[in-house]
């Protein structure tokens, strides 16, 4: 786990967990994850799940995406999605509130790869530069994404060539995030 993205993601995950502890909630909680199997689940009450990010051993990959669209993904994208299991984590980047997308389980990883593949196919059809989403904001047509060509983290308008660079790379983006605690 020496890759800068893996280290920055682990560091942010630790800050996220600490933010939950500091508010007296213990582990992060979610009603959306009830009944789902994952190595990061601490407790499933039937009404809500408590969870914590854990290192993924062995590290996963996104080979299904790369084979499916015949493209080599930027190493930062692979490291972002393959180094840990975690629920999505709420954060702020400057004034932008977002949910940092994560892989919750092996099954969730398969679903994620299908979604990424669909996203890349649509971009290819629209003749847009390839990106992979890593975060969602409160907007139906914008996502936080990694540009596959440059590794920059961008605020992207889906289906259009409208992109604002947020950070030069994923590690620096993650280092600038501030955890947000949202109660279920």
UniProtKB/Swiss-Prot annotation:
Compartments, record wording: Cell inner membrane
GO annotations of cellular component type: cytoplasmic side of plasma membrane
Coiled-coil residue spans: none
Alphabetized InterPro entries for the sequence: Syd, Syd_sf
Membrane topology classification: Peripheral membrane protein
Keywords, in A-Z order: Cell inner membrane, Cell membrane, Membrane
Function recorded in the entry: Interacts with the SecY protein in vivo. May bind preferentially to an uncomplexed state of SecY, thus functioning either as a chelating agent for excess SecY in the cell or as a regulatory factor that negatively controls the translocase function.
Family named by the database record: Belongs to the Syd family.
NCBIfam families, sorted: PRK04968.1
Name by which UniProt lists this protein: Protein Syd
């Amino acid at each position: 786990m020496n890759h800068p993205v893996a280290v920055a993601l682990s560091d942010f995950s630790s800050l996220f967990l600490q933010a939950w502890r500091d508010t007296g909630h213990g582990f992060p909680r979610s009603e959306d994850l009830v009944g789902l199997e994952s190595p990061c689940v601490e407790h499933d009450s039937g009404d809500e799940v408590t969870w914590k990010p854990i290192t993924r051993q062995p590290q996963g990959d996104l080979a299904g995406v790369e084979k499916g669209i015949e493209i080599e993904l930027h190493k930062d994208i692979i490291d972002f999605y393959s180094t840990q299991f975690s629920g999505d984590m709420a954060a702020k980047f400057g004034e932008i509130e977002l949910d940092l997308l994560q892989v919750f389980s092996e099954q969730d990883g398969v679903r994620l790869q299908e979604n990424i593949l669909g996203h890349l196919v649509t971009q290819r059809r629209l003749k847009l530069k390839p990106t992979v989403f890593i975060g969602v904001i409160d907007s139906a047509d914008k996502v936080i994404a990694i540009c596959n060509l440059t590794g920059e983290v961008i605020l992207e308008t889906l289906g259009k060539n409208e992109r604002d660079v947020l950070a030069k790379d994923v590690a620096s983006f993650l280092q600038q995030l501030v955890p947000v605690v949202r109660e279920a």
